Amino acid sequence: MAGIVIGAIVGSVVSEAVGAVVADAVLGMVIESGITAAAADVLGASLATASFIGGATGLVAGGVASLAVQSVIGSNGPSSAQSAVAAAQAQGILLNSQSNVDPIPVIYGRRRVGGTRVLIEVSGASNEYLHIVVVLAEGPVAAIDNVYLDDLLATDAKFAGLVTVNKHLGTASESADSDLISAVPKWTTECKLANCAYVYVKLKYDSNAFSGLPTITADVRGRTLYDPCDGQTRYSNNAALAVRDYLTNPLYGRGISAANLDDVSFIAAASACDARITSPAFSDTFTADAASDTLTFAQALPIDTGDGIKVSTVATLPTPLTATTTYYAIKSTDTAYQLATSAANAFAGIAVDITSAGVGTHTLTQADYAAYTCDGTVDTNQTAYDNIRALLTACRGMLIFSGGKYRLVLDIATTASSFGFTESNITGSWVISQAGKRVKYNRVTAGFYNPAKKWQPDLAMIESTLLRATDNALILEAKIDLPFTANSYRAQNIGQLTLNQSRYGLVVKFSAFQEGLRCEVGDVVPITHSTPGWSAKLFRILQIEIKDNDEVYVVAREYNASIYTQAVLAPAAVIAESNLPDPFSVPTVTGLTLASGTAELLRLADGSVISRIRVGWTAPSDIYAQKGQIEVQSRIANESAWSP
């Protein structure tokens, strides 16, 4: 069937002579066929816009409406959609803003976010209580896990007795927070914030705990996703299911009817996303707590919920863990995890009941991880076109509108079609183009957000010294944005595939009889022809267009299954946080002694005598505190005010 592509496969290369450039690691692909005005508008692009973006000629020539053109739309550079979405996320996703018009993000998978303050009020006899309401995301979300004040857990001992957090998941039936109604009269029962996931944070003034208004962030498990495989809706970060959710949601997505989706393709894509990839052998030691079923580590780990792990020990493992079993991680905090017996249980939060801490030193080793996940925020201020392309980067996806339905196909190793092009169905002349160095890479740098580094932007770089030598030592680099990838291994894998695919840039353009409509964009087909000397050489279809003479125009790119072989990656490097002391954490003065007697009296020149109290304390062991100042305050008995 025919269609319009509004994106591109990772690393696709089509010569400028072909009329469509798919280059420099454009990552998302949306393909539409059977184009009508309604089908085009559903993604926020008119036919005229799609024609311009795709660089496709004769898009609607000849009045073809029910079966139009398939075309790869890309850019001569990194995807502008990726860059726009990534830039929007980088600007303030971990900050707090204050506005009544800010767009509310949609969270897929797990993400740490800031939010928009919609209320700041004080209460108490001396205004000692501060009340803050921060909207985090479009609701409902699966869970709001940890809340942080200036990157410190709200449950930290530093905030004991000073911080109260109420979490609201943002259901449609959400009620106004009763505690906030009691504390702040202007917050009434009508202030429900329905469909908004938010936190209400109450702070009690303490100059030692707070140096100013803290930045409030939270770890959020985002949207629950419908899975057409079993008809269930549950929390998941499966990239294919996230794309499906965005397409069908009428509030923040495109509101496409489920009847217009080819769920067989979405099920296949979701299964491909869940495929397990053997991970580098990252390991670290842990202690187990039977009371909380938790494994605790000394540092943040590059391990996410759903990752497969194994455990070992020098003595006795915590009961009932065994060394031969693959468990699945449930991430509680950056340094604390629980274990589940399956990936499904991990996402459902069903943890293994640990009944003993074991004996000796225990080690956790990462075993595997899902091929593609979607962990990030959708900026609802961006166009649906840009957001869909950005979502597709998480799974190297192609969204195709064909036969009246949208289908999702991943750019993965694909079995060749039984149908092929030969001299019997290829007509007329054709063009063969080889991509130049502008779209060939020997280095790819992928930008992503790293949970192991408090969700700060990070880079994963893949480089081939062999290819660089082939390229006369020139650095041929592509920079790509992966706004919905939150794992260094996945970012490296996508970067490696981008690099590999760029080296197979041979593109063929030809006309064929209508028999060519037996294949679709995304299919891998063999081409046999004596002119170039090809015998069942494999190509992936990038474009199909019906011509005025009832022939079809085909553009295909060289296909090689070897590019999908997973590279051997090094274990992620864990960078320890600074061990400098917290400048806002002041050690408690100990060993306080008070003495008042004849030795402490002060006799003035006029003969008068002033009574004094000598104060003593144990010198602090902290060298930073030793070089600081200690302030002594006193008050008269039965009075409340202290003075220096």
Question: Where do the protein language model's features map onto the residues?
Answer:
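Recognizes extended acidic, P/S/T-rich segments that occur
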Residues: 629-644
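Polar, S/T/G-rich
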Residues: 2-6, 10, 18, 22, ...
